[in-house]
């Protein structure tokens, strides 16, 4: 193990994050990560929940920070856990991600440095993309929440 690996700070608890399957005119916004975690993969915009912030407030803030869009969180659409380990089995990252179904309210996509690209796609048209694990299922569940809330 190198000195860099030994000096790396490992988490002591899971990191709580939110994401948003944002729907506009029957399409969902898919973004490609520009850096780790999930570098180069398509996923949903989102990020960490700050102390004192509700989950819905975190969704609104993270989406605005990453995409410049204004959204309305509709409902929780499931959960996802992402755990990565180093070669020795130590936990490098442990995310608990709560994806929300959300409606687009206003704005046009303008990405921050965390994201490389964004596309509005049909919810059923994700299979040709390299995505984070379970993205298709999350988008399907989110679409069901959007339709049920009409």
Regions found by a protein language model. Give the residues of each.
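Acidic, metal-coordinating catalytic segment for phosphate/diphosphate chemistry
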Residues: 1-19, 90
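A structural signal for short, well-ordered beta-strand segments
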Residues: 20, 76, 100-102
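Conserved hydrophobic "DFG−1" position in protein kinase catalytic cores
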Residues: 22, 30, 102-104, 120
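Conserved Nudix-box catalytic region and its N-terminal flanking loop in Nudix hydrolases
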Residues: 27-65
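A short coil-to-beta-strand element that immediately follows conserved catalytic motifs
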Residues: 70-79
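Active-site-adjacent beta-strand/loop module that shapes the phosphate/pyrophosphate-binding cleft
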Residues: 80-108, 142
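NUDIX/MutT-family hydrolases
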Residues: 99, 110-142
């Amino acid at each position: 193990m190198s000195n860099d690996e030994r000096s790396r700070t490992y988490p002591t608890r899971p990191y709580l994050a939110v994401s948003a399957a944002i729907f506009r005119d029957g399409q969902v916004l898919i973004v490609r990560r520009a850096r780790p975690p999930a570098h180069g993969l398509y996923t949903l915009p989102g990020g960490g929940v700050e102390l004192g912030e509700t989950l819905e407030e975190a969704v609104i803030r993270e989406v605005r920070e990453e995409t410049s869009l204004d959204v309305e969180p509709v409902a929780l659409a499931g959960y996802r856990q992402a755990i990565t380990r180093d070669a020795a089995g130590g936990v490098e990252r442990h995310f608990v991600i709560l994806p929300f179904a959300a409606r687009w309210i206003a704005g046009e996509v303008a990405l921050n440095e965390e994201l490389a690209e964004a596309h509005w796609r049909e919810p059923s048209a994700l299979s040709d993309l390299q995505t984070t694990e379970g993205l298709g299922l999350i988008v399907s569940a989110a679409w069901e929440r959007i339709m049920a809330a009409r």
